[in-house]
């Protein structure tokens, strides 16, 4: 995808915020527990390479990604000796590529290990489906057979075992405890404990520090976003959001009563009013459902009117502004703030989706 460096729309990523979130989390972890930075999906929209560098500077001991290509991108960017785990499914034919690049892979089926062609040792992490229902083995018998397979094959190393909690971001913990118990049953069935036992995502690491095991997978909260609104007031420290999204007005005009804007003419002025066109649209991740949401102009709310277009969006101004005036879509402006949580609430989604949707057509600028 082409990045739009030559238009006035950009994302600012505050590296100091990422470092602070990591340090605050590390301060509550035992020294024996590693923090792995989850940088999948372009670091939740924040930029995988720069975030990985920032996280490593802050003390992260490794990285988690969703697909092998993300792991290879880290290797190509210079992270040659760092621990990297692919959390998602990888094709069998790509196992050798991972092995040669010292990338750890998730294994969740016995048959995946059959007839592998490897030129180097493949490090694997056994995924346990303790109740998430996506990937993973579900019985002690499966776990023991996979352990035996890895023990009998000198090119396989059972480096880790893990699970993922479905409800760690909820205050009610009965299902979480049920998952943890099932995982522990499978863990204790192994003859030898792997080097890395890990279960905690951001929510679990924040609210259930006792289950850190050997490492935590620090994702959404590394970026300063709460895992869910339900637990926001129960967090052990304040999270510092790292992402801000800005643009500028490229056209300002006054509408007369009866004038309409955008596709479908769904918005019609009922009085004289000032509007501005912004060079950002749903092709950038500002999806059509943002219509009716507000941005900030000089600290004042300005609603998005009409339909969001592919490349442009129109807002209603509180008064006349000059072309080139700055607009805050996510971030702080003169004491007021629009957050990813605000957008998520309006869109009936979660903050993860808000930032992940912001694609690479919007340039990232890294500050602090």
Curated annotation (Swiss-Prot):
UniProt GO MF annotations: alanine racemase activity; pyridoxal phosphate binding
GO biological process terms held by the UniProt record: D-alanine biosynthetic process; peptidoglycan biosynthetic process
Positions of substrate binding: 134, 310
Presence of the UniProt keyword Isomerase in the record: yes
GO cellular component: cytosol
Uppermost EC category: isomerase
Cofactor(s) this protein cannot do without: pyridoxal 5'-phosphate
Database matches in InterPro entries: Ala_racemase, Ala_racemase/Decarboxylase_C, Ala_racemase_C, Ala_racemase_N, Ala_racemase_pyridoxalP-BS, PLP-binding_barrel
Modification type N6-(pyridoxal phosphate)lysine: residues: 40
UniProtKB keywords: Isomerase, Pyridoxal phosphate
Residues of the active site: 40, 263
A Pfam family this chain is assigned to: Ala_racemase_N
Catalytic activities: L-alanine = D-alanine
Keyword Isomerase in annotation: yes
E.C. number: 5.1.1.1
Pathway field: Amino-acid biosynthesis; D-alanine biosynthesis; D-alanine from L-alanine: step 1/1
Family: Belongs to the alanine racemase family.
NCBIfam families: alr
Function recorded in the entry: Catalyzes the interconversion of L-alanine and D-alanine. May also act on other amino acids.
HAMAP family, alphabetized: Ala_racemase
Name assigned to this protein: Alanine racemase
